[in-house]
Amino acid sequence: MFPYPTLNYPPMAPINPMAYRDPNPPRQVAPFRPPLAAQIEDLRRSIANLTLKQRAPNPPAGPPAKRKKPAPKPKPAQAKKKRPPPPAKKQKRKPKPGKRQRMCMKLESDKTFPIMLNGQVNGYACVVGGRVFKPLHVEGRIDNEQLAAIKLKKASIYDLEYGDVPQCMKSDTLQYTSDKPPGFYNWHHGAVQYENNRFTVPRGVGGKGDSGRPILDNKGRVVAIVLGGVNEGSRTALSVVTWNQKGVTVKDTPEGSEPWSLATVMCVLANITFPCDQPPCMPCCYEKNPHETLTMLEQNYDSRAYDQLLDAAVKCNARRTRRDLDTHFTQYKLARPYIADCPNCGHSRCDSPIAIEEVRGDAHAGVIRIQTSAMFGLKTDGVDLAYMSFMNGKTQKSIKIDNLHVRTSAPCSLVSHHGYYILAQCPPGDTVTVGFHDGPNRHTCTVAHKVEFRPVGREKYRHPPEHGVELPCNRYTHKRADQGHYVEMHQPGLVADHSLLSIHSAKVKITVPSGAQVKYYCKCPDVREGITSSDHTTTCTDVKQCRAYLIGNKKWVYNSGRLPRGEGDTFKGKLHVPFVPVKAKCIATLAPEPLVEHKHRTLILHLHPDHPTLLTTRSLGSDANPTRQWIERPTTVNFTVTGEGLEYTWGNHPPKRVWAQESGEGNPHGWPHEVVVYYYNRYPLTTIIGLCTCVAIIMVSCVHPCGSFAGLRNLCITPYKLAPNAQVPILLALLCCIKPTRADDTLQVLNYLWNNNQNFFWMQTLIPLAALIVCMRIVRCLFCCGPAFLLVCGAWAAAYEHTAVMPNKVGIPYKALVERPGYAPVHLQIQLVNTSIIPSTNLEYITCKYKTKVPSPVVKCCGATQCTSKPHPDYQCQVFTGVYPFMWGGAYCFCDTENTQMSEAYVERSEECSIDHAKAYKVHTGTVQAMVNITYGSVSWRSADVYVNGETPAKIGDAKLIIGPLSSAWSPFDNKVVVYGHEVYNYDFPEYGTGKAGSFGDLQSRTSTSNDLYANTNLKLQRPQAGIVHTPFTQAPSGFERWKRDKGAPLNDVAPFGCSIALEPLRAENCAVGSIPISIDIPDAAFTRISETPTVSDLECKITECTYASDFGGIATLPTNPVKQETVQFILHQVLQLLKRMTSPLLRAGSFTFHFSTANIHPAFKLQVCTSGVTCKGDCKPPKDHIVDYPAQHTESFTSAISATAWSWLKVLVGGTSAFIVLGLIATAVVALVLFFHRH
């Protein structure tokens, strides 16, 4: 029962029920109160009643409500003296997520449902667009009764299961979008970056159990569903499912990605299976059981959860690290430094505590990574960034990192250090030296390695610039975190330690350090060997008769070819390589802009490079004619530019394209000398031939009349009758032989036929009558079959209203006029925005730089060993007998000649392969796609994607468009191409498995992470030198590096027709080759009947200014007088003229000025405004600019190239000369006839 309410005021006195009451009490008169006072009093009483009588009962007993800051309850006075114990220190709360992340988490929590398997979350299913999507690789049941009852369909190609959600849930689902501009998006773990068509997150963000989570944009729409991921350097690439613009699902899976279902990966330890993130001996770790921990890691070397097991072994202690940096440093506490052979210690060969194992210089800007036998950032007792450790004999010693120095031709700058590795910025040199000072002792090691500054881009600068342009490059990351690359470790082999042996009581005594084990080997005279953990006395009397080996199984060492391998079956471990090559952005120099000078069809570049700079050019026509030259000093270069265009690229500047215009210095419409100057600049050879012809005609015309008159004068002076034996001229004789003739008229012909041949007379008479009958029959057939024929033609026209052929040139529109009987013409414009030739490709293999792996050799003292086959690429193994190795100054074996050494070597991918590799593709016939802008009538459609195959129709609004196929089946790609970085090369590479040493393809694999590695590097093992533990070998240089030096120019620099080569997918864009047939079906709604078309009267077109072959260089004025003010269309009937604007409002009375582009000297085009038409004529001048940065229109016809003025002058010239010739001939004939008649 709930308690009664407690009253906080004193109770009233009890009333006596038997008290006397007057039955007729006197009536009391209430005192007079003003109305306002009475109202106030009533209000006061009502408030008092509410506060006293309407008290709420106490709340029932139950859990208190959650509050951020609960109010303290009142306590009695005695309780104030006793202070409660201080509350436990609460952990610092994580910062609240941002607004976008909160919205993302809210939407995800409402629309995403976990998939349960064995009581734990294995993945997620999300509801998008009225459907539920569940990853196919995620097993389990959706944690929702309604969704779990849905029957899902499988789409294995997308790794998804999907089904329609119930009707009650369709209004509460997420919406998807195909718009994915580059930038950042949201998901459960924060921001996701989308760049280069890939979703990436920082490494370590997301993982197992996140499959099925959605990626949202700022509006809460789903852009992708996560399926898995793969680590790529410092970031993780996500495998996702997205949607394209047509709403079709698209799967994007990077190479090597793994599904992110929360499937527990198991590891093994001595026949015990356990989760890799929970070793069976938890909370034991490396500090407590070092040997067992190393053994556990070695047995799970090939497990895909090796990183989890390593992390659990290193972080198993409860002590919290200060920062994540120290956490990754603690991985190398499993290893120790060592002493190894160095070829040059400053004086000679020696066993050095800082021997150089490897030098890598594959990054740009002169950064190298050095691996040594010393360790950096570690002390003997823990992690310390300011110290380095090395082996001082048999003990480990630490000194300050300031004592370390690195140099090539000059001292290097130390960038970072970690584990066995140093990252340094070095000047160019042929050798690398690493050393340190330990008090008075100085240790150095020098190896031969060429260090050079590798510039980025097309300019050979020698120092990093202060400013410039950012270009992709390769760099070594400075992070020490897990980057996905490993260095191989193993437990060290046995090394003789003579300090463990001593003479005690004339016997050899073996002293064992505390907590260690020693293996001994004695020969006095019988051979005795064993392992002891306490002091042991042998029967030998001389220290030389025994060898003692300290068993060091608590630390790993690098699996070096300069260290002997341990006896028996030795397992391997691995640690992360700290500084790995990654893709980055580097600042490259930008050469000074060239000084450009334009002349007629000539481009002059004045170049002033600061350092050697590459200049490349190519023609944009069918013959690319590429050039490539390095400019080292200021110079001037000239290039011929044609109407097809020229592209030049100077240094790291973007490529520029220029086109020649039909410019000239003269005037094609001026005086003859101006016409000659104009055509001489434009067509020099043709002009010279024409001038020579005209001069020859003039000379002949002048010489012939003079000779004729001289001959006539001679004939007139010497008549025929006075000359003896005179002969008649041949011309007069021929004229005399001609018989005069006379033609009869029609009546005489008919009279002759009637009298001589009446049959032929009637035949001639009936011919006109037969022709009249045939014409009448044709007209009758037209009346009978004409309507049906027109209907058929109308149906055909409705199916494809307009067909034409347009040039395959981007940016130059095709314009036409579509006419229909009874309708106003409709303007049609089709412009190519982008074209792509996309071939089908097949990846044969990838190739990259290899790395030779040399394991520790097996040294068998006083015995023999043998090689075994191992599945490694280009694996080489050889046993050498009669070796006598020394180890750190002492003999390693008893025997002199009976010892054997087994040397091994093989090839593997270098660490740079993940970012620096080439892909070999076989190319087959592909497809052609285009993006077009279409305008018909008042309808405009932008960026429509169509297939240029002549078969696939594209829906453009209510119109249907079919484009293609191309008139020329051409492609810039050969049958084999190589993709390297962002460039594509036509290269005839060898087939898979047939690579040759030292050439392209000496290292091959299907993907960058696959195990099908093929190598042919001519690897040969050499006999080791006496007294040194090492594995010498010879090998051919990397064929990939050789190909990079000799690869030549990429397709972007040599492809004809101005093609631009792009990737993802491989394609050639905007190739101006051939022509494209088009066919478009225009709907009836786009046509306007003539009765509804506005009319315009009094049209007159006047060209006020015109420059041909220029970008809308013509200006014309059109006086108009429309019936009513409307917006009308202007329609051109010619193709060589283009209007800048096709629609404009026309006023009641006034004029309209429009711009047009033409390639003719004398433009004469018909312009139609509504139903009225007018012809525009005029003269155009040549353009003043010789070179422009846009493609200009050029005419190729002879009649259009020669102006009317030039034709007029030519006619006058030829016409005057002909007149003189004709007059001379007539005079000659007259004189000859007169003389002839006088003679006879």
From Swiss-Prot:
Top-tier EC class: hydrolase
Positions in the Extracellular compartment: 261-682, 744-758, 802-1216
Any one cellular-component term (Gene Ontology): host cell nucleus
Disulfide bonds: C848-C913, C861-C893, C862-C895, C867-C877, C1059-C1071, C1101-C1176, C1106-C1180
Location of the region described as Ribosome-binding in the Swiss-Prot/TrEMBL record: 97-111
Annotated transmembrane regions: 683-703, 759-779, 781-801, 1217-1237
Annotated site residues (Involved in dimerization of the capsid protein) in this chain: Y185, N218
Name used for this protein in its record: Structural polyprotein
GO BP of this protein: fusion of virus membrane with host endosome membrane; proteolysis; symbiont entry into host cell; symbiont-mediated suppression of host gene expression; symbiont-mediated suppression of host toll-like receptor signaling pathway; virion attachment to host cell
